[in-house]
Every structure is written in C-alpha cells, then in structure tokens.
Amino acid sequence: MMMSLFNTFESPYFLGFPLMIFIAILISLTMFIPDNNLLIKNQSSMLASTFLKTMTKEIFSPIKKSGHSWALLLMTTLMFIFLNNITGLLPYTFTVTSQLSLNMAMAIPLWLGTIIMGATSQPSHSLAHLLPEGTPMTLAPFLIVIESISIIIRPLALGVRLTANITAGHLLIHLVSLALINLTKSLPLLFLTFSVFILLLILELAVSFIQAYVFVMLVSLYLEENLI
C-alpha cells in the first residue's frame, strides 16, 4: 500500500544497491558501441539522425563557431533528459529526472563549464556582465551583488525547473489514474475521466520534450554569453 504520492519518486533499490548506480553503468557502456558507419541504417536511426541535426541547427545557429564544440555534449544531454522523461511515463517505472540530485548533477557542471570558458578566454568581458553599461556609480555595488546572485542560482533554477515540472505532471497522472479506479461503477464519469487522462498523457509527452529542450537551450544561452 502506498503511504504517500511522493513514494513513486523515491529511488528504488536492486540487490541492496540504488538503481541509479545500474543506470550509470548502462550509460557508461554506451561508450563501447561501435561507429555508426558499421551499423545498418534503418528508418528509426535515420529519423533520430534527422531530429538531432534539426535540433543542433536550432540551438547552435545563434552561437559563434567557438561554441560549436559543445554540440555533442548538449545534444547528448537533450536526448538523455528526453528519453528518461518518456521512460518515466511507462507503468511501473522510475522517473530518473524527478530526482533533484540528478538534475543538479547535470546542471552544475554544464553551468560551471560555461563560466570557466568565459573566465579563461575573456575575463574582462565576463566581468562586464556584472555591471550594465551606463549604471550610476551609487548603484554599482548593489547591481554587482544582484547580478552575481542571479548567475550563481542559474544551475539551481535549471535543476528545480526540470524536477518541479516532471514531478507535477506525474502527480497529476497518478491522481487521475486513482480517480479512474474509483469511478468504475459510473460509466459517464469513467469515460470523462479517461478522456482527461488521455489528454493529460499527451500533454506530458509534449512536456517531456519541452523540458529537455528548455534545459539545453538555457545552457546554450549561458554558453553564448561567455563566448568571444
């Protein structure tokens, strides 16, 4: 018996170990997959390739060439978040991206990488973001503190946004599914609730991609801000 709705977001254990460890091992094993040129192309792989090319052009078109080396990393992050969001919608599965610890583990290194790139390649330009041009000297100390705080909380905003949206959607689906079970004796209400459930599921499919896209897009904006 489930004691709380949030029990579904607790990390499950397998043989006494957190399932997150096994997921990390499986992801690391993908590094040993042979080159795509050795694999047989099918419709699914061609569709995935077209999708990745389109998203790469969409995200990196406004970014200077010096930041194009981030394309592989950010596209991998997008697909990782998107596939985990989709997998979490399946019955009896664990939603990895509902864990703030995982989302922060992705957000902090990416954000820190953009900061380090800006600080090493153009330190004066990066520091100039802390004080807008034309600011009165009396307001300069306050604006520097405010801008510094806004930059520091960026990874927290990335992680919390993804966690909150995925968690809220799964809770709504869980509540509607409980209503379906309790309304089996009333066919009109059952049909209405089932229609709401299907619409909500379609919405969550869209949210799964939107949240992955927003996460990567925001990181690309941070990257663009620190490029020469």
UniProtKB/Swiss-Prot annotation:
It is a multi-pass membrane protein. The chain crosses the membrane at residues 13-33, 70-90, 100-120, 140-160, 162-182, 190-210. It holds the Pfam family ATP-synt_A. One of its GO terms (biological process) is proton transmembrane transport. InterPro entries: ATP_synth_F0_asu, ATP_synth_F0_asu_AS, ATP_synth_F0_asu_bact/mt, F0_ATP_A_sf. It catalyses: H(+)(in) = H(+)(out). Keywords: ATP synthesis, CF(0), Hydrogen ion transport, Ion transport, Membrane, Mitochondrion, Mitochondrion inner membrane, Transmembrane, Transmembrane helix, Transport. It comes from the Eukaryota. The keyword Transmembrane helix applies. It is found in: Mitochondrion inner membrane. GO terms for molecular function: proton channel activity; proton-transporting ATP synthase activity, rotational mechanism. One of its GO terms (cellular component) is mitochondrial inner membrane. The keyword Transport applies. Coiled coil: none annotated. Subunit a, of the mitochondrial membrane ATP synthase complex (F(1)F(0) ATP synthase or Complex V) that produces ATP from ADP in the presence of a proton gradient across the membrane which is generated by electron transport complexes of the respiratory chain. ATP synthase complex consist of a soluble F(1) head domain - the catalytic core - and a membrane F(1) domain - the membrane proton channel. These two domains are linked by a central stalk rotating inside the F(1) region and a stationary peripheral stalk. Belongs to the ATPase A chain family. NCBIfam families: ATP_synt_6_or_A. Component of the ATP synthase complex composed at least of ATP5F1A/subunit alpha, ATP5F1B/subunit beta, ATP5MC1/subunit c (homooctomer), MT-ATP6/subunit a, MT-ATP8/subunit 8, ATP5ME/subunit e, ATP5MF/subunit f, ATP5MG/subunit g, ATP5MK/subunit k, ATP5MJ/subunit j, ATP5F1C/subunit gamma, ATP5F1D/subunit delta, ATP5F1E/subunit epsilon, ATP5PF/subunit F6, ATP5PB/subunit b, ATP5PD/subunit d, ATP5PO/subunit OSCP. PANTHER family: ATP SYNTHASE SUBUNIT A (PTHR11410:SF0). This is ATP synthase F(0) complex subunit a. It comes from Myxine glutinosa. The gene is MT-ATP6.
